[in-house]
Amino acid sequence: MPTRSSVLLGLISLFILFACRSAYAAPLATLAVETGRFARVETPVSVSLAGVPDVESGVSLRLEEVKGSQRIGVPAQIEAGNPPRLWWILEGTTPAETTRVFELVKGEPVETTSVKAVKSDEFLDIVVDGKNVLQYNHAVVPAPQNMRNVPPQRRSLYDRSGFIHPLWSPKGSVLTDIHPPDHYHHMGIWMPWTHTRYEGKMVDFWNVGDGTGTVRFAEYLSTTDGPIYGGFQAVQEHVARQTSEGEQVILKEVWDVRVYNVGGPDEGYWLVDFKSTQRCIAPEPLIQEEYRYGGFGFRGAREWKGEDSAYLTSEGKTRADGHATRARWCDNAGKIDNEWEGVTFYSHPENFGHPEPMRLWPEPDNYIFFNFCPSQLGEWEMDPGVDHVFRYRWYVHEGKIVVEGAERIWNDYAYPPQVQIEVNES
């Protein structure tokens, strides 16, 4: 005959069981990820959390994948905003036309390695699991002391802030270059405009040596650490130095850079998203003249030269025939210590002029320089108060590019998985 204590214990156990079932039956939200026409491999996904209860209350939230009777914890990250967004990685390989189901519940989040933004007085490093990915330079980096064909009194025109260098490969090679002797104004990864007009006068934010323009870091809006991505938002100023008002900020620009917690040295790649939002804050428009280069630029490692370097575009173009063509993506690669490494740049489908025309150096014995350049299409204007948004994904990889892999990254970027959310309002 059961004792009073055993009956009480049984009731407590039954209560706990029903409580657990109730919790599983009533998540805060159910999320269905649909891969669509393409297979996915380690793909970042996100969804708006508008209307989801407790998201902004400080309550700990946990993401779980539902696989039959199993619920498997998944690392996730909430991006602040109005509304906030939930980010996670669709782990592993997921076939096309597949749906995976997740639930957002109250509970401790899954712990994993994180992406960190580490700031010093001179620069900010983005680090994944202790490995450097990229460095953003907010302090002014002086030009070299001995510059060929540049008078000493003009050397300071080449001092710069507001650019990325180094960009590291997964195994730690430096893939960018700054102040190279053939083009002292090249600054790793940077985004100035070249042939522009303001108040009817030429302003060159790119070449800088004529003293008419430059770009400089202004301030950080945010830095982010997290299990899914880390990054920063930085304000930059495009400055015309010889206007009727003297030195004047013409464009206010925000860089939003995030590095995802995928790939790494073992998998041989990094994945980076870059967004530039530019607004003319001057009283008159900035006129962009038709020109062969200007905009998002990349100067490759000094080792990448001649036969030890290569371009390949999404349309199959190379160094020999790629300049002034248009493409969805372009791979830039070369040998360092006798091993191939590279970075593929993807132009977002919503970018102005997409698929964007490109500046590639065609000379067979030259270095690697790359530029998405919408100004090749003709003259255009940046009117006061209007935002111009440019988005680019970077696939930083070991080895030569594999077209199938490059296209997979493109599909993730241009046609991301769709996430359907059902909010439990009870």
Task: Name each region found by the language model.
Residues 29-33, 126-130, 272-280:
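Short, well-ordered beta-strand segments enriched in hydrophobic/aromatic residues
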Residues 1-11:
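Bacterial N-terminal signal peptides that target proteins for export
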Residues 136-169, 262-310:
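Acidic (Asp/Glu-rich), glycine- and aromatic
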Residues 116-120, 225, 235-290:
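Acidic, contiguous internal or C-terminal segments within carbohydrate-active enzymes
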Residues 9-21:
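Bacterial N-terminal signal peptides
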Residues 26-114, 136-235:
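Alpha-mannosidase-like glycoside hydrolase catalytic domains involved in N-glycan trimming
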Residues 89-94, 345-426:
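Beta-strand-rich recognition/accessory modules
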Residues 286-354:
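Active-site/ligand-binding surface loops and adjacent short beta/alpha elements
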